[in-house]
Amino acid sequence: PLKKKTRWEERREVSQKAKRKAMKAKGVYRAPPANETKGDYKGLCILIQFPDEEGTIPKEEVEEFCNKKGYKGYGNNGSVYDYFYDVSGGKLRYTTIVTAYYTAKKSKGYYTDPGITYGDRAIELIEEALADLKSGGFDFSTLSTDDEGYIYALNAFYAGSCDNEWGQGLWPHSYGLESPFEVGDGRKLRDYQITNMGDELSLATYCHENGHMVCSFPDLYDYAEDHKQSCGVGHFCLMCFGGEDQKNPTQVCAYLKYAAGWADKVTSLTEGTHTIKADKNDFFLYPKNPAEYFIIENRFQEKRDSTLPGSGLAIFHVDETGSNENQGMTEESHYECALEQADGRFHLE
């Protein structure tokens, strides 16, 4: 039900327009990556509790969950930092500033009221917390921004369980503030994700939402807005189902790694025999034009991919002008990213 574009979606649109322009040129090209996400990035995580429900997970634990190398708390396979460092081959170093708990102005029930338009009370709560941070002299200057001054990542962790059904109140979601929240020196906040903390912390959803905000990654599952459900690329990407273990989500798929600039080696296929390793970001590419191509990687059921449905070569068909709402499998209407299935039965679609 949340329809307004976020800042990361706007960044993707700019990239897609550039790809469409490139497609008008004659000839076959290696598809150029979108804006790369490499180097040091720093995001923000605001901890929120309520007058009638205090936070039970200490700030120090959340800091370790976000940043500590080799973190094992609650059975997680590393920290958020570890996840992005590993899947990027060390090319993205993403750390997070975690605030002290902010106590909301009203009881939890006010913000979870299912009768209020979805997102409204979440935005109210986040803006309360931001105003408190700003008035207290918080230093926003160290947070990473895009070229228009928008801070990439604003995470809100709130105390306790999620008391709502899907599409209500504080049900976990990512969206954008009604208007940019100015914090000085041309910096502003707009995109956010909000999640309940529960009794323990888990990597999967947090990493997925930061994949949106930091890397401008799209969802590779089907929103079913056309009332036809499909499975996108299934468990073969963080930005789709991401595996069956919330504490050890699967890797980002080859398409998005390539777009983010995380490839170690890209080989354009023409003819001959080629070898590709499973423990590196090495990809084969067979391009049709700058926005449509096959990209191939070797995936193995171990480490971050331990819950994959299978091992071997994963062949993705990419049409960067497509959509994962397009489950018709026609020549004119493609998925943005589809996993080719050996039996040809289109089970994922």
Give the positions of each predicted feature:
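Sec-exported extracytoplasmic/periplasmic mature domains
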Residues: F50, A131-F138, H212, S216-L220
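Intrinsic-disorder/low-complexity accessory segments
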Residues: P1, L44, R304-E349
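Short, polar loop/linker segments at the starts of domains and inter-domain junctions
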Residues: T56-K69, T250-A254, N326-C337
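Soluble non-cytosolic domains of exported or imported proteins
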Residues: T56, G119-E124, E200-L201, T205
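Active-site-surrounding "flap" and adjacent substrate/cofactor-binding loops of secreted or lumenal enzymes
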Residues: E54-L92
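Primarily auto-inhibitory N-terminal propeptides
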Residues: P1-E63
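Active-site-proximal segments of metallohydrolase catalytic domains
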Residues: K26-N35, G78-D185
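Extracellular hydrolytic enzyme modules, especially secreted metalloproteases
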Residues: Y81, A153-G310, F316-T321
